[in-house]
Amino acid sequence: MSIDEKIVEGKYVFLKDGNQYSEETFTILMDTAPNGNYMYKSEILCRVTSGEFLKINVDFETSNSFDPLNVKVFRSLGENSSTERYEVNLKDKQVYYTFSGMDGVHKFDRNVSGKFHISTPAFVTSTLMTKMKKMNAAHVTSYNVLSTQNIWTYEKQFVENDVFLELKSLGGVEIKLNDKDLHATHCQMSEDAYNNPEKSAPADFYLSKYLNIPYKAEFPGNLEVKIDKLKAFENEYKNMFKSWLLL
């Protein structure tokens, strides 16, 4: 019998003009069976203007090669709640989507060819596609991303959009977080391969060596997301990580 074992856990803080407005705690689990899957579990908390807490729980299961298999996003705010689910059949590339919200249950499915990522509110999964498909050191790398606008009520089916990642330093860069000196992979994420000014400005991501999860990211508008705590269980999984970190 396989067992899901914890390999990484941590916490992100979300900042606007240096002030924290949200936080995310996460755990990454690995199935101990041969060619076992990974599970990313995240909880996001944010106080809204009414004083209530918006709570979002994300479960993101991938294959051992980091292809998405099952994704669940549960949102709750006061009396409102909704659930999104994606189920992926990797053999025929069929994606089954279900939304349950204030206006009932909506279902549809679609064939999606090639490699793809599924966008969620969980920051820990924001660069997961770089494990599924490595960034090209010489060129901008494109990724197909599925996303929806469905939050409390059903708006429409998921859409496919390309996002582009560009490596900014082949040898990595040194950054400081919580008085710790860290080595990170610096890349920029944008909606346009040529940084067209009519598109939104790119965001700077600094990726860790722990399954490429971000140490931090800087967005236009003086927005920042960064690791507040991070523990990698390297003693048990020394072959997966190049170094050990505890923040």
Language-model regions, residue ranges each:
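Short, surface-exposed linear segments at secondary-structure transitions and domain or protein termini
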Residues: 63-69, 113-126, 210-216, 233-240
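Short, solvent-exposed aromatic-acidic interface loops
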Residues: 45-47, 73-83, 100-106, 219-225
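Short, hydrophobic/aromatic-rich segments at coil-to-beta transitions
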Residues: 2-10, 35-41, 65-72, 93-95, ...
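N-terminal cleavable signal peptides for secretion/export
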Residues: 1-57, 63, 71, 78-85, ...
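Hydrophobic alpha-helical segments, especially N-terminal targeting/anchoring helices
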Residues: 62, 175-176, 206-208
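A short, polar/proline- and glycine-enriched secondary-structure boundary/capping micro-motif
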Residues: 50-53, 79-88, 106-112, 225-230
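C-terminal structured interaction module
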Residues: 183-247
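Solvent-exposed helix/loop surface patches that form functional interfaces
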Residues: 2-21, 91-183
